C-alpha cells in the first residue's frame, strides 16, 4: 500500500500565513518561508500554499513567495489561488511549484483543467473543491461546491464535480469541508468517503482537524489518500513527526525519516 501523506496547509493573504474558522475570522500565523522550512524539517510529505483572497480580490499570483520557499524547501509544493489561465500554471511551475491547484477557475472554465493536464501532465494538476452540506436532515446527503474563498455558491454537486474533474485530467482532488474548516471537530467523513469512493484519483481530506485521531480517521474512515491540516501544526499543538508516529501506530503506512 502506498504511504499516506501528511500535508500542512498554508493559507496566505497579503504575503502572510493566516488561519480562520469556516473561511472567515482570519488571524495571523506567521511568515510563509519560515513556516514552510519548519514543516520541511519536521518531515512533511508536501506543503500546500493557497492564496485565499487572490481570486476574490483579483490579485496576481504569489510568485515571489513561491520562489523564496522553493529555494529553501525541498519537498513538493502545491500552489493555488489566482490561477486563471494556462499561462498562470506555467509561471507557477517555473517559480518552483510542483503542483498547481485550481478551484474557482476550474468552475468558471472546466476546459482549463483539461488543457493544463494535457500540457503539463495530470500529476501536477490538483482541483480544489470547497464543499458545504446542503441536504436537509433525513434527506440523502448532498454537498454543494462553493468558489471565491467559499463566498459563492455554484449549484454544482460536489461528488459529481469531483468525478468530472478527474475525467478531465485532474491528478488529485483537494477536498475541503466548509462546515468543518477551522472548527477542530474532525473531517466531514461522510463527504470525504463519498468523494474518495467516487473518483479514481487520490483525494486529500481537508477541513476540521483538531487532533491526531482526526488525521487517522480521514484515511481509515474517510478513505482519503492524504490528510491536510493547518491550525494544529501552525500553533505548535503537534508536529508533523508526532502525527506520522501516531498514524504509524494505527497501522497506516507513512514515510518516516528520509
UniProtKB/Swiss-Prot annotation:
Pathway: Amino-acid biosynthesis; L-histidine biosynthesis; L-histidine from 5-phospho-alpha-D-ribose 1-diphosphate: step 5/9. CDD domains: HisF (cd04731). Its EC number is 4.3.2.10. The active site is at residues 11, 130. The keyword Iron does not apply. It catalyses: 5-[(5-phospho-1-deoxy-D-ribulos-1-ylimino)methylamino]-1-(5-phospho-beta-D-ribosyl)imidazole-4-carboxamide + L-glutamine = D-erythro-1-(imidazol-4-yl)glycerol 3-phosphate + 5-amino-1-(5-phospho-beta-D-ribosyl)imidazole-4-carboxamide + L-glutamate + H(+). It is found in: Cytoplasm. Pfam families: His_biosynth. One of its GO terms (molecular function) is lyase activity. GO terms for biological process: L-histidine biosynthetic process. Its main location: cytoplasm. One of its GO terms (cellular component) is cytoplasm. Keywords: Amino-acid biosynthesis, Cytoplasm, Histidine biosynthesis, Lyase. It is an enzyme of class 4 (lyase). The keyword Lyase applies. Heterodimer of HisH and HisF. Belongs to the HisA/HisF family. PANTHER family: IMIDAZOLE GLYCEROL PHOSPHATE SYNTHASE HISHF, IMIDAZOLE GLYCEROL PHOSPHATE SYNTHASE SUBUNIT HISF/H IGP SYNTHASE SUBUNIT HISF/H. IGPS catalyzes the conversion of PRFAR and glutamine to IGP, AICAR and glutamate. The HisF subunit catalyzes the cyclization activity that produces IGP and AICAR from PRFAR using the ammonia provided by the HisH subunit. HAMAP family: HisF. This is Imidazole glycerol phosphate synthase subunit HisF. The gene is hisF.
